């Protein structure tokens, strides 16, 4: 029987700011069976896309992507916030509603032609996805898909990537 993951996501009104509904995945993470089931679904998706490596943006992308990579037996590459990686890095900036931010990856993290699936907890405006995809492509990788626990469809992040296969466990249309 399929799991309705939406039943296990807590909706928190006015967090972190008034008028925002925060979708909290920690109830899934706190339940080993749910966490494993969510990981398994994303891993099945990544396998179907031919993923050779999983990339997850800091920080919740680590929580989502690492177990997917482990289940598939492939590597995991973190896309980190600035000044967190010790060797030479590639950088990409992205916009937020209140400013901008930067993600970095080691320059040798992705091999040319390597097939990559990006895993993260949530896609809203897709700024993080843009930056992560740009990093991977600048390093010669091929982004073959992106997988999320949650997609906020009203924010139209998916529409910015008409040629990218995107998978989400849960969709909310009342972002």
UniProtKB/Swiss-Prot annotation:
Keyword line: Cytoplasm, Glycosyltransferase, Purine salvage, Transferase
Chief location of this protein within or outside the cell: cytoplasm
Pathway: Purine metabolism; AMP biosynthesis via salvage pathway; AMP from adenine: step 1/1
UniProt similarity note: Belongs to the purine/pyrimidine phosphoribosyltransferase family.
Class of this enzyme: transferase
UniProt cross-references to PANTHER family, sorted A to Z: ADENINE PHOSPHORIBOSYLTRANSFERASE (PTHR32315:SF3)
Cross-referenced InterPro entries: Ade_phspho_trans, PRibTrfase_dom, PRTase-like, UPRTase/APRTase
Enzyme Commission number(s) of this protein: 2.4.2.7
Function (record text): Catalyzes a salvage reaction resulting in the formation of AMP, that is energically less costly than de novo synthesis.
Gene Ontology terms, MF aspect: adenine binding; adenine phosphoribosyltransferase activity; AMP binding
Localisation per UniProt entry: Cytoplasm
Protein name: Adenine phosphoribosyltransferase
Subunit structure of this chain's protein: Homodimer.
Cross-referenced Pfam families: Pribosyltran
Gene Ontology biological process: adenine salvage; AMP salvage; purine ribonucleoside salvage
Source organism per UniProt: Lactobacillus johnsonii (strain CNCM I-12250 / La1 / NCC 533)
Catalytic activity: AMP + diphosphate = 5-phospho-alpha-D-ribose 1-diphosphate + adenine
Recorded GO CC terms: cytoplasm
